[in-house]
Amino acid sequence: MNPSDYAESLTIQLRKGFLVYCVLLSCSKQEQYAGEIVRRLSDSELMVVEGTIYPLLNRLQKYGYLLHEWRESEQGPPRKYYSLTDSGFELVDELKHRIKMLNSSLKDLEKGVN
């Protein structure tokens, strides 16, 4: 595999790894329905595959990090709006901290510092 293709493959894996954090972070700012989350992540070039969002939202609800509320829509059927639970906000803070630590470690490694 050439370096460019391999780098693209690794980038896809990194995006998948960050997807939970990105979804939670997006919902931490305001309640959103799945289409808004997908659009926001797509605009940020963070979306891996649209079909991964719905199972992820269900999993985050199952684990108690998200809640949903059905709301009528002016355009089309009712929409399911997602918001974070207290545990969801705690998870966002924990992930933010760990990502900063990883970023710092990578910067140190690039500088040649242990």
For every predicted segment, state its role.
Residues E31-A34, Q61, P78-R79:
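A generic structural signal for ordered secondary structure
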Residues Y54-R59:
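Short, hydrophobic-biased segments on the C-terminal half of alpha helices
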Residues G64:
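Glycine-centered, phosphate/nucleic-acid-interacting loop/turn motifs that mediate DNA/RNA or nucleotide
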